[in-house]
């Protein structure tokens, strides 16, 4: 196969490649077998017309497009391999020459993976973070657990305070007219939770059970409902009941209620301390990794093709939709609830996608600079891990992974991150 690659400005180039006569003939033969199955030609049973009759009646050129569709995936893949390029999207292929009995000539404007100019990536300074669990952190966790065991008790003849839960009716009015979505009865609301628009919960503080009030507020300018954004409204409210949290004492009995595997508060503290210590060490390690990667990426230069960003954004959007589905929602419902649009969400995803794409490109470049190649032992170990995780046989995992290119790429990137971490200087 004759292949020519002409690098142009940026990350785009022109790929010229040929399909030789013998290969063209193979494609035409396969195309005829495909087309003949659907043909109805007088004098012949369906799907039984001879090739010679087909050529006389329709012309061999009638098979060209089908033959090209059949051959193109194979010959294009071979062409990019011979040209030594790494396309980042599927280009439009143009026909330069497609004459009978001759070699076919095709061209494609191909966007390729960009070159990365690495900056400093070894010996990068990172913040030294404390990994030892503090007494304050343990006490804060115990307080949270203690408050989770709290019971709500009715507050008799006392005003509502932040932290109390009130049961109320409310109805919102704009210009004296009730607006949609502004009404509820026997609604439970924890004061200070920030569930309502600014000012609503604050103005309930001080009211008692049985009180009625008119609360004058202005909706935020960025509120999702355009007809209410920035508009003054009045909420008519009636408090039916006020409940306050009754927090139990932090003792052995509470410890057993929190965790049935312990008998005393000291045992609970020891168990929680171990969990929090491990979590803090993991958090510190993750923060160090993120910081050193961010600095290596910042020091590198790369011109990222928009196609890569767009593809990654699409990937993130698909994950977002799957996460919503797991919660019983659809993207359409999410946009309706939040007032956001799909276009705005995709634009935000593109910002995140650009960061992810650059990070991966830089880490791949570091792996290449360090001549990192995963060993067979590392590959086999990763396959064993995946097999155990998903409850599959190792051979099934290997079959699912195919040529292992994705797995090898992941292992290379992990090793590249290790290079950054091992050489980082904590200060």
Swiss-Prot record:
EC number: 5.2.1.8
Enzyme class: isomerase
Domain PPIase FKBP-type: 163-248
One GO BP: 'de novo' cotranslational protein folding
Gene3D superfamilies documented for this protein: 3.10.50.40, Trigger factor ribosome-binding domain, Trigger factor, C-terminal domain
Gene Ontology MF annotations: peptidyl-prolyl cis-trans isomerase activity; protein folding chaperone; ribosome binding
The UniProt record lists the keyword Chaperone: yes
InterPro entries (alphabetical): PPIase_dom_sf (IPR046357), PPIase_FKBP_dom (IPR001179), Trig_fac (IPR005215), Trigger_fac_C (IPR008880), Trigger_fac_C_sf (IPR037041), Trigger_fac_ribosome-bd_bac (IPR008881), Trigger_fac_ribosome-bd_sf (IPR036611), Trigger_fact/SurA_dom_sf (IPR027304)
Protein's UniProt keywords contain Nucleus: no
Catalytic function, reaction form: [protein]-peptidylproline (omega=180) = [protein]-peptidylproline (omega=0)
Compartments where located: Cytoplasm
Superkingdom of the source species: Bacteria
Annotated GO CC locations: cytoplasm
Main localization (coarse): cytoplasm
UniProt keywords, alphabetically: Cell cycle, Cell division, Chaperone, Cytoplasm, Isomerase, Rotamase
Pfam families registered for this protein in UniProt: FKBP_C, Trigger_C, Trigger_N
Protein purpose: Involved in protein export. Acts as a chaperone by maintaining the newly synthesized protein in an open conformation. Functions as a peptidyl-prolyl cis-trans isomerase.
Family: Belongs to the FKBP-type PPIase family. Tig subfamily.
Domain remarks: Consists of 3 domains; the N-terminus binds the ribosome, the middle domain has PPIase activity, while the C-terminus has intrinsic chaperone activity on its own.
Official protein name in the record: Trigger factor
Species this protein is from: Listeria innocua serovar 6a (strain ATCC BAA-680 / CLIP 11262)
